[in-house]
Amino acid sequence: MSRYRRPRFKKIRRLGALPGLTSKRPKTGNDLKNQSRSGKKSQYRIRLEEKQKLRFHYGLTERQLLKYVRIAGKAKGSTGQVLLQLLEMRLDNILFRLGMASTIPQARQLVNHRHILVNGSIVDIPSYRCKPRDIITAKDEKKSRTLIQNYLDSSPPQELPKHLTLQPLQYKGLVNQIIDSKWVSLKINELLVVEYYSRQT
């Protein structure tokens, strides 16, 4: 299954705010009316919508998300918490959380077009898993720095999560630690996502 490329507003009307996909937000009043008209949701639909919310926010294919769920299931600790940590530590998401890109799709383009270095080396894989003490910088070229400066200027002001540090004048971000789940920017019940996949197997 491919990544979602159709109009984004339809998704946020149904699933709620998806900051990684778009900065647009649904009109709350209309959405509540639509939801009440649609009647009570089944447990399956509730789990499905949480899964879709996670997938669209991080810009993953169904196969990619399933792979992350399986990796999280084999790790120590809560599967849902580990799943969120894996997704939050992706390079494209780290760039988004730093404000060096306005959305995760924009961050993915920066990485794909080789504008980003990790610890001094170009990384062109958006799913690259960042680690504590990683240093993320823009390539030392005018085009790369101009792109990132534009994103930094246009990104809505928000509190930087504690696991990251931004040095905007140097176009540099630092990963201080693995993210704590309370700093995840998406409102999500990750246990419902894990339940969704456990019932599919």
From Swiss-Prot:
Location(s) in or outside the cell: Plastid, Chloroplast
A Gene Ontology molecular-function term?
rRNA binding
Q: Where is the S4 RNA-binding domain?
A: 89-150
GO terms for cellular component:
chloroplast; small ribosomal subunit
What InterPro entries does UniProt report for this protein, alphabetically?
Ribosomal_uS4 (IPR022801), Ribosomal_uS4_bac-type (IPR005709), Ribosomal_uS4_CS (IPR018079), Ribosomal_uS4_N (IPR001912), S4_RNA-bd (IPR002942), S4_RNA-bd_sf (IPR036986)
Where are the stretches annotated Disordered?
Answer: 15-44
Ribonucleoprotein as a keyword of this entry, yes or no, is yes
Pfam families, A to Z: Ribosomal_S4 (PF00163), S4 (PF01479)
Asked if Cytoplasm is a keyword of the record, the answer is: no
Q: Which HAMAP family match?
A: Ribosomal_uS4_B
Q: Which PANTHER family match?
A: 30S 40S RIBOSOMAL PROTEIN, SMALL RIBOSOMAL SUBUNIT PROTEIN US4M
Q: Which family does it belong to?
A: Belongs to the universal ribosomal protein uS4 family.
Name of protein: Small ribosomal subunit protein uS4c
**Which organism does this sequence originate in?**
Cucumis sativus (Cucumber)
Gene name of the encoded protein:
rps4
